[in-house]
Design a protein with these regions (language model features):
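C-terminal beta-sandwich/jelly-roll accessory domains of carbohydrate-active enzymes
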Residues: 133-198
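Loop/helix patches that line or flank the sugar-binding groove of alpha-linked glycan CAZymes
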Residues: 1-125, 132-139, 153
Length: 198
């Protein structure tokens, strides 16, 4: 908006400025949120400034609410976890495998300020591994991602029996669901959030 006004004040044709901005506008990669299947997708009763996606009648939040494994429910779980988990909300952040071409690996660690019933300050770690490509990602064994992370101080053996907190590719994995263990392979576009307490 600022660039547009600056160019018009400088004497440029408004239509030409808009034409020049169109290929680089962030609006090319987004549409209004589709809340429901109504004519304006529940986004507005007026006219949105950019067009709705053609599938807004079938792909929307209301169609995914309550459906295990849906993007809506996965985000709902992530938001709840952010509110309920001290390591996620308050813990230190460490990016691992920063040069990996397809994986995001994040370690969060939090130490409770108050001793527990044993007199120790509880330490909780969360490890997120997300495969951001369609190919499978090998995690364990020789040549697996965790073996490569040993150089960054991550001990793979500590995570083999960790609790699986959330798994994008498996809606049955939820906090407290009892799923444990590091998967050997993450499928394309899958992620796993693991928790261990020390």
């Amino acid at each position: 908006v600022n660039h547009f006004h600056e160019r018009v004040r400088a004497g440029d044709d408004p239509a030409a400025v808009l034409t020049g901005l169109a290929p680089i506008s962030r609006d090319n990669a987004r549409t209004p949120v589709h809340w429901d299947g109504s004519e304006k997708a529940g986004f507005t009763t007026g006219e949105p400034w950019i067009a709705l996606a053609p599938d807004h009648g079938t792909v929307h939040a209301a169609a995914q609410a309550g459906v295990p494994g849906s993007v809506f429910e996965h985000y709902r779980s992530l938001i709840a976890l952010r509110h309920d988990d001290d390591a996620l909300a308050l813990g230190t952040f460490r990016l691992l495998a920063a040069d990996h071409p397809t994986a995001w690996v994040i370690l969060r660690q939090w130490r409770s300020p108050e001793p527990d019933e044993t007199g120790e300050n509880r330490v909780e770690q969360l490890l997120l591994i997300a495969q951001c490509a369609r190919d499978d990602l090998t995690l364990t064994g020789e040549g697996g991602l965790l073996a490569a992370l040993a150089a960054e101080g991550l001990q793979a053996g500590q995570w083999t029996e960790a609790e699986q907190v959330l798994r994008a590719g498996d809606p049955d994995v939820q906090p407290g669901s009892g799923h444990a263990g590091l998967p050997a392979v993450l499928a394309g576009w899958d992620s796993v959030l693991l928790r261990r307490r020390a």
